[in-house]
């Protein structure tokens, strides 16, 4: 029986996606508020830097693990302000999270040029060579088979298409590392209990972050999936990193 990690627990590979779905379904309505509280607002700055990696908004963009739509809606607003002809597809395996994204898109009057697709990052329902950009923010670590998801990203991107991933990473500096670990394992689950009523969901969150490969390990995984010009940029001392690569 193939096993994988669900946080620090070992589970059957076939069960992980359902467990992850339950986590996000249970916190969907508090997801954005929790992001602000957990990161002390820093996630907004990280995401702003992330979308700067997309210079050409006259593009077909696939946002995978789109969640509540933060990345896609930032791009849609930026494109609208610049009168760009953007095409954005928001994909997530969790329908409850996509419902949150749709609500936000309607509230912000950004529904035009957006498509919503319930799909797994491991099996995307799109033809080869479909998109100019593939974005995924804080989602790849939740995928049961990360290598398979990376190969799918490579498949759906056009030649010279750009893969961009924002993910929690490994802090280098000792004093930041110690504080970050204490904050992650002791404070974040407590905030999750107080605000979302779900301590276990946020225990999974910090455990999944702790187990995610280092910047250099993930860079190798991206390269092995078929990408070229693979690199990364650390933000906030390595709390998160932006990974980027191109198809051939």
UniProtKB/Swiss-Prot annotation:
Pathway: Quinol/quinone metabolism; menaquinone biosynthesis; menaquinol from 1,4-dihydroxy-2-naphthoate: step 2/2; Cofactor biosynthesis; ubiquinone biosynthesis
Cysteine pairs bridged by disulfides in the record: none
List of residues binding S-adenosyl-L-methionine: 68, 92
InterPro entries: SAM-dependent_MTases_sf (IPR029063), UbiE/COQ5_MeTrFase (IPR004033), UbiE/COQ5_MeTrFase_CS (IPR023576)
E.C. numbers: 2.1.1.163, 2.1.1.201
Reaction equations catalysed: a 2-demethylmenaquinol + S-adenosyl-L-methionine = a menaquinol + S-adenosyl-L-homocysteine + H(+); a 2-methoxy-6-(all-trans-polyprenyl)benzene-1,4-diol + S-adenosyl-L-methionine = a 5-methoxy-2-methyl-3-(all-trans-polyprenyl)benzene-1,4-diol + S-adenosyl-L-homocysteine + H(+)
Family: Belongs to the class I-like SAM-binding methyltransferase superfamily. MenG/UbiE family.
Protein name per UniProt: Ubiquinone/menaquinone biosynthesis C-methyltransferase UbiE
Gene: ubiE
